Amino acid sequence: MRRLRWLNEHVPDEPFPAADQALADPNGLLAVGGDLSPERLMSAYRNGIFPWYGEGQPILWWSPDPRGVFLPGDFRISRSLRRRLNQTRMQVTLDTEFEAVVAGCAAPRPDQDGTWITREMIAAYTELHLQGCAHSAEVWLDGELVGGVYGVALNGAFFGESMFSRMEDASKVGLTWLTAQLWRWGFALFDCQMSNPHLARLGVREIPRSEYLRRLEPALRAPHRPPPWTLEAELDPVSEHRHREGP
């Protein structure tokens, strides 16, 4: 029987167990405890691990099998989303309101009981943003923030953490623009952690953890994209995703 490793909160450079040591039930639970220091968080992402826990719980570290990912060419733009992209007055920016996007993701939702984005998590990812490691895409309508996405970047891999919408399709619009720009910059992997029906409709594929780790390794050798991030003026997300599609 595999036993969970308890991490020492005072040793941020403590190595994680190998991802393949994660439990099968609950799927992917690997370690408990530690802290959310930038050093430990970035070590986790480099090893295919991420934190996910609720209020009142210790920090829980996960590496599920299978893993939900977007790869270049995977993103599916439906007819309705294409119409939204072509007709909407929504505007998309990068890295202009990171804290507001995280707050939007942490806000209560009708279909959820509580939030996993605790105050501790908000502080930790805000610090990563200040260090140039965490990034956001903001979706605006008439000057109001109506949606967004945030996550962590490591060389050629982006690890999506959460997204939110205050109007129909706002998060899809933000995700469409963000992934298009990432592919343009040469990113090789967008990690969604775990798939769900919403993401599956957009093209997320589930791959075995072993394959995920194989794909992560070369992505981590790609060049670093320095902050601040901005969308390229000539970027057309529909054309960019179509260009990446296979025959």
Curated annotation (Swiss-Prot):
Lineage: Bacteria, Pseudomonadati, Pseudomonadota, Gammaproteobacteria, Chromatiales
Localization per Swiss-Prot or TrEMBL: Cytoplasm
Gene3D superfamilies: Leucyl/phenylalanyl-tRNA-protein transferase, C-terminal domain, Leucyl/phenylalanyl-tRNA-protein transferase, N-terminal domain
Gene assigned in the entry: aat
UniProt xrefs under InterPro entries: Acyl_CoA_acyltransferase (IPR016181), Leu/Phe-tRNA_Trfase (IPR004616), Leu/Phe-tRNA_Trfase_C (IPR042203), Leu/Phe-tRNA_Trfase_N (IPR042221)
Molecular function terms, GO-annotated: leucyl-tRNA--protein transferase activity
Annotated organism of origin: Halorhodospira halophila (strain DSM 244 / SL1) (Ectothiorhodospira halophila (strain DSM 244 / SL1))
Biased composition (Basic and acidic residues): 238-247
Reaction equations catalysed: N-terminal L-lysyl-[protein] + L-leucyl-tRNA(Leu) = N-terminal L-leucyl-L-lysyl-[protein] + tRNA(Leu) + H(+); N-terminal L-arginyl-[protein] + L-leucyl-tRNA(Leu) = N-terminal L-leucyl-L-arginyl-[protein] + tRNA(Leu) + H(+); L-phenylalanyl-tRNA(Phe) + an N-terminal L-alpha-aminoacyl-[protein] = an N-terminal L-phenylalanyl-L-alpha-aminoacyl-[protein] + tRNA(Phe)
Disordered: region residues: 227-247
Keywords: Acyltransferase, Cytoplasm, Transferase
GO cellular component, one term: cytoplasm
Record protein name field: Leucyl/phenylalanyl-tRNA--protein transferase
